[in-house]
Amino acid sequence: MRKFPFVLCVIFLILGLLACGAQPAGPDMTTKEETAMLKAGYARVNITPDYGVPMSGYGNDAVRISSGLKSFLFATCVAFSDGEDTVLVIQTDLSQADINVVNEVRGWVKSKHNIPMENVMIAGTHSHSAPTVSGANASMEYRADLIGWLEEAAGEALADLKPVTGIYYGNQNCPNLNFVRHYTTEAGIIKGDGLNALVESPYTGHTHAADDLLQIARVDRQGGGSIVMANWQSHPHRSTSESDKELSSDIVGVMTQYVEQEMKDVLFIYFTGASGNINPHSRIEAENITKDYKEQGNALGKHAVSILRGEMSRVEGTNVQVCTSAYVAQINHEDDHRVEDAKKVVEFWQACYDTDQTRRVAYTYNMQSIYHAQRIIERSYMGVTQQIELSAFSVGDFGFAVAPYEMFDTQGVTIREESPFQATFVISCCNNAYGYIPSMEGFENDTYEAYSCRFKPGTGEALADEFMSMLGQLHTTK
């Protein structure tokens, strides 16, 4: 009888200890990074029209209707998902992205796959031998077809999501494959390719050396089918003359074919970098340059394969993050007198356009002056400011800055070199089409990209700073 209370005490003690063990152990401090299972998906869809369409170029008044085919055009999509957040980037063999097309596709992805609209990004390779999708000349039939094809690419990439076993990064300088298209002359004048190509004195050099760094990322996946991403800065090679009416994926298509044939089990996607002032050819180094888009694409492909077969650095991390910013930029308005002068120039040119006087007008004003006058008038009808949607995302320790405009190479270098991430791609011509936004050097050199820009000088540098802030924000929370 005397032992019973002791036995009860022991039992109650054991039950108490068990009860304590069953209590919550405090908050779960496991991070998203530690639990994420990164997956990547890929898809490629043919977006070549089988009918004649207006083609993109330099905004020429003459409309080129396609009548032939050099190579097929594609939309290529890569998707990344960590189980919580998903991002899709669709690269198209088109000049640029049209915001209305982008929003249609974003809306479809959101409704079908519950992915936020800002997590869907659509870019152009900036091909000048592709259908135009913006403005009055665009084919509405092609736009409708394109939207369906882009939705198809997004859906297929999401269906293709497979576990990532590793991401690897490498780069290589590619001399004589791109050039800054602004030149100094013996007369101390800055000239450029395009509308101000007439020169009063011989060229003496480039305003600065081009950013010739080719970046490559390889995303290995469970079961094979590695995704290879390339980031290179250059305008296309193909002509935009009135006689050139053949559709072409240009340098990108040739580079894609070369890499996939050489490396076999890889899936290639190309992103256009900061190339607003970069061409694939030079007026003063003709003996060193590639002669056409096929030679250019194969040369870049060889560099890419060299990187892939060499030693690449493993990129750590598995989480996916997206950041957006609505930057308010100032419109570069001219005074009333400049606007009136511009109207007189355009009126005179239009009166002589397509007549025997066209050549005389070109010599009177030169095409650069006419182009400049047109832009001055356009800006006079704009408001004081315009909002520019910037995007950035990260996959582990890999950052991506997504620009809806043609960025100059110096801004791209700044973002890449000052980014807190192990590696950073700059993707231009993505999500919208704000045209050129030059560096301060571009404005000071008085080139046609500066004439074309609707925003005030200094906007390019301010946007680069904004991208750095966005990448910093992503890096601190990765």
Where do the protein language model's features map onto the residues?
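Bacterial N-terminal signal peptides that target proteins for export
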Residues: 1-8
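Bacterial lipoprotein signal-peptidase II cleavage site
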Residues: 21-27
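Small-residue packing motifs within transmembrane alpha-helices
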Residues: 12-15
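C-terminal motif of bacterial Sec signal peptides marking the signal peptidase cleavage site
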Residues: 17-19
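Conserved beta-alpha junction segments in alpha/beta enzyme cores
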Residues: 29-123, 131-267, 271-284, 288-298, ...
